[in-house]
């Protein structure tokens, strides 16, 4: 597992989640559009952490456009019925 890559993306996701929670609590004008942008950003990082967990450091650094699109998709190899 590429722990550095996973940790980077989980940290980014955590920061977005913290920011979103803060904005929902403190900003009465926070709207649907802002929420969509925040959740898209959050899922991008969570999904990338999972989908690219085993890529080499070199591949993570070079990250092609195809890699970027593939890694940010919802995982297909996680059982969500638990």
Predicted regions mapped to residue ranges:
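Short, charge-rich amphipathic interface segments used for partner binding and complex assembly
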Residues: 32-73
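Charged/polar positions within long, soluble alpha-helices
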Residues: 15-26, 44-58, 76, 80
């Amino acid at each position: 597992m590429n722990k550095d890559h996973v940790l980077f993306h989980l940290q980014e996701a955590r920061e977005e989640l913290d920011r979103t929670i803060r904005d929902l609590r403190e900003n009465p004008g926070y709207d649907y559009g802002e929420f969509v942008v925040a959740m898209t950003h959050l899922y991008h990082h969570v999904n990338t952490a999972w989908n690219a967990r085993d890529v080499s450091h070199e591949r993570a650094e070079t990250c092609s456009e195809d890699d970027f699109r593939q890694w940010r998709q919802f995982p297909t190899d996680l059982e969500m019925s638990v």
